[in-house]
Curated annotation (Swiss-Prot):
GO molecular-function term, one example from the UniProt record: zinc ion binding
Catalytic activity, reaction form: N-succinyl-(2S,6S)-2,6-diaminopimelate + H2O = (2S,6S)-2,6-diaminopimelate + succinate
Family matches, as InterPro entries: ArgE/DapE_CS, Bact_exopeptidase_dim_dom, DapE_proteobac, Peptidase_M20, Peptidase_M20_dimer, Peptidase_M20A
Organism: Pseudomonas fluorescens (strain Pf0-1)
Enzyme class: hydrolase
Active site: D75, E141 (proton acceptor)
Similarity field: Belongs to the peptidase M20A family. DapE subfamily.
Reported function: Catalyzes the hydrolysis of N-succinyl-L,L-diaminopimelic acid (SDAP), forming succinate and LL-2,6-diaminopimelate (DAP), an intermediate involved in the bacterial biosynthesis of lysine and meso-diaminopimelic acid, an essential component of bacterial cell walls.
The protein's required cofactors: Zn(2+); Co(2+)
NCBIfam families: dapE_proteo, PRK13009.1
Assembly: Homodimer.
Pathway: Amino-acid biosynthesis; L-lysine biosynthesis via DAP pathway; LL-2,6-diaminopimelate from (S)-tetrahydrodipicolinate (succinylase route): step 3/3
Protein name: Succinyl-diaminopimelate desuccinylase
Gene (UniProt): dapE
Amino acid sequence: MTAHADLSPTLQLAIDLIRRPSVTPVDADCQKQMMQRLGDAGFQLEPMRIEDVDNFWATHGKGDGPVLCFAGHTDVVPTGPVTAWQIDPFNAVIDEHGMLCGRGAADMKGSLASMTVAAERFVADYPDHKGKVAFLITSDEEGPAHHGTKAVVERLAARNERLDWCIVGEPSSTTLVGDVVKNGRRGSLGAKLTVRGVQGHVAYPHLAKNPIHLAAPALAELAAEHWDHGNDFFPPTSFQISNVNSGTGATNVIPGDLVAVFNFRFSTESTVEGLQKRVADILDKHGLDWHIDWALSGLPFLTEPGALLDAVSSSIKDITGRETKASTSGGTSDGRFIATMGTQVVELGPVNATIHQVNERVLAADLDVLTEIYYQTLIKLLA
């Protein structure tokens, strides 16, 4: 194994961050370490602790030009059974295959190290750069995400801060670093549906109303519905039922209600209000006595080809020689909150094959490549 002092600045920082057990929403002083580095490089620092969540906002530059923000999270998901890991998940070692192993290596302490080192180099090489380089970092991405990026964005918007471009360090790559970037995400709309019946004895169904029998045709119709056709950037909106619960546990009792939980992953072709109305129309069509609690996790967003996507794509080409693919697949990310400011958002990070898994790992050399891509993107946009 390579000695720590012989590693690149990016890998040294990545290892230092991984060795801090920052299971969400705990930051474990990861942000303190990043702020120390950025402060030494001349960034203005603004810690923002909101409830039990650590966040910070940092900027470099005094011009009125465009703002390029790096966004990310220091929190990680729990390790799962430590005995299932080949190493201590918070020890952070580079194995004989050149893989950096540890919780957060891919998601997303590797990216945090790459963007920090890239920004340090850029402001040293171009101290009078155009506009501003910014960082928006949270410890509440893997958890509820109420007091992290969402809350910071609300504060920034309230004081009329502008973010023109944002690179989120989520692990976007699939096989090779930079082979895929995310230029958008689907929206996520969840629902808890309660269908009310009348409880009774199974031998006397005429004295009861079975909510399972009543709800089944409506749920089947919802599952078969074509909500939209998608577009050039998004697949069609999907509807999935994740839970259905009813019954008292007894075999001779007709239950009094049924609860179904479902989720839409929706494209820009659909709206929250439109989906809610269509669901209500189908439920009413079946004559149900129903109630829904809706939960919107995020609206869909899309960054079409333009300054940011062009700069990221050409930087990947310059450094790796490969053409990148822009995709909107996958789950939600904090990019959904930043996009509400009218910001162009692109997610670019290392290979995501082992995120949230036991023995999470990333090719160590990829983080140095990622640093170069971030650095070149800074040059193209702000030098």
